[in-house]
Amino acid sequence: MKPILSDATAAPAWVVIQLLEECNLRCRMCYEWGEAGSYHALDKLAQLDLELVLRTVRECLPHRPSFEFFGGEPMLYPGIWEVIRAIREGGCELAFPTNGTLLEAHAARLVEQGPTRLWVSLDGPAEINDRQRGRGVFKRVMRGLQALEAAKRTAGSRYPELGITYVVTPSNADHVADFFLRGIDLSLLSCVSIELQSYATREQAQAYGQALSTHFGVASTPCANGYVRDPAIFSGIDMEALTAQLVEVSAACAQRGILFHSQPQTLEVENIRNYFSARWQAMIDRRSRCAIPWITAEISARGEVTTCHTFNDLPVGNIHEHSLLDIWRGERLKQLRGYLREQLFPICTACCRYWGGAGALPAPRKRDA
């Protein structure tokens, strides 16, 4: 049996591919294209060459990883159907997030090719959602969900399963229960994910930049800077009311057999308050270890390989130069893992996977990070 956090794994269990940087929305809280997003500074947007994506997918297929896309908006990628087909015909699961605005146009083809799950982003009733994501977006997404459900019924297919991702911000924190219990037909969904807005303080971003400079020779951290928010912007949220809504939606999902995920997992008032106050050490869900860098490979639209969204400033290789599996077994990733065996980065609390528990391991007894 391999030890926990072993470098001996032949391939990642989870491969996440950023097909492109382009998006057709400008959601206010997005760390890529939002008000403080890092992509506004890009001179030219990147997207991966289709043949390079397919070659990387085929390289991984014998190891049967789970795949995920992200963007930008993944459904804007011209070669998405070829990539979906290669993954699904190769016997692997595929899930990806989408803003939902293109579902109606592609409902039949999505059902025909059958990605395992789509995570559709909605942030409240129409007026509230559109305040964050853009005018008319809610209606377009709802039409898409209905078209997809109709196409699934016609084909007699369960795929793609549908999930809703709801990002809690100061603008929509009062509307969580209203949306899920009265604003959407829960019978359409197999899963619900409610995530408190990811962010980092200025001090965390600076400390992260210093760590990357000192230990890895990285000169700048523009991606990390896209997460920076002042915790004061969350001070108007009614933490008691928000927590009660989260618990209510969780119970409603449990009654209907819908998978419920929250970030953080512990739905208690003080835990939620500590999150929005950047009191990370007081969080019940805090971690001092994470398994994600040992199981996940993320490929950016520029070909750069990292192990986590929050490490996009710290690539360990590029698939334009080396194969993904060579990078996975390479010295740069071993160096990163060696660092993370001793401590996490200051920016790790800005990661949804850190709070979601997908990669969490119990903290060693000898440390209290």
Model segments located where?
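Short glycine-enriched, charge-decorated loop/helix-capping segments at active-site entrances
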Residues: 40-46, 131-137, 312
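Flexible mid-to-C-terminal extensions adjoining Fe-S/redox cofactors in radical SAM and related proteins
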Residues: 1-11, 33, 275, 279-369
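Short loop/turn motifs at secondary-structure junctions
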Residues: 26, 63, 114-115, 158, ...
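Radical SAM enzyme [4Fe-4S]-AdoMet core and its adjacent flexible, acidic
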Residues: 117, 121-123, 130-289, 301, ...
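Short, solvent-exposed loop/turn segments at secondary-structure junctions
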Residues: 22-24, 74, 101-102, 125, ...
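Residues that line or immediately flank small-molecule/substrate-binding pockets and catalytic motifs
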Residues: 34, 71, 122, 196, ...
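Short beta-strand segments
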Residues: 16-18, 71, 97, 163-166, ...
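Conserved alpha-helical substructure of the radical SAM core
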Residues: 1-117
